[in-house]
Amino acid sequence: VDSPNLLVISETSLEDMLDSIRLETPDVVIVDSIQTLYNPALDSPAGSISQVKECTMALMQLAKGQGITVFVIGHVNKEGSIAGPKVLEHMVDCVLYFEGDRHTSYRILRAAKNRFGATNEIGLFEMQDEGLAEVENPSQMLLSGRPDDAPGTCVACVMEGARPVLAEVQALVVTTASG
């Protein structure tokens, strides 16, 4: 991305990152990922409970002191929880999960924690050539290409957060030899 309004810094040292933020005075900072950031003043490896806690605390203090919005990205494990210490979830104002399947172009943004708003909302997006685009009508997307009166199918309304979504349900039933 070539833009005079975007600065990318490849840095894992907390002190160097904070110095760059103070020098550049950005409106928004994105840290990807907090598990790779380390404070050299601590005798623990990056990603440890103490490192994640101290690095997050330093970013929070800088953000609040300078009025900067900070997005802290954390890795998730196979179970879908934020990898490493749970302390990160308790420190931040909002926890969002960006979910998707590598075999489809659709992604869901789901709020798991929000100190300033609802957590029962989702956003559905599609990865396109221009980037992520909102899917304004998920029901239409889920039902597109569905033949009318297809045997063994029906449309069901399910709630995804506070949003009703229409989806196709399929079932095949056959009689068995035992009746």
Can you name each region flagged by the protein language model?
Residues 50-75, 91-102:
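Substrate-engagement module of ASCE P-loop NTPases
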Residues 4-5, 64, 81, 98, ...:
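Active-site phosphate-binding and catalytic loops of NTP-dependent enzymes
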Residues 4, 67-68, 90-94, 105-107, ...:
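Short glycine-/polar-rich loops that comprise or flank the Walker A/P-loop
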Residues 1-61, 176:
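Conserved inter-motif catalytic segment of the P-loop NTP-binding fold
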Residues 81-91:
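Short regulatory helix/loop adjacent to the ATP-binding pocket of P-loop NTPases
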Residues 18, 40-41, 81-83, 107-108, ...:
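Short glycine-/acidic-enriched loop or helix-start segments at secondary-structure transitions
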Residues 12-14, 33-36, 42, 65-68, ...:
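Short, ordered loop/turn segments at secondary-structure junctions
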Residues 22-29, 35, 100-179:
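Conserved P-loop NTPase
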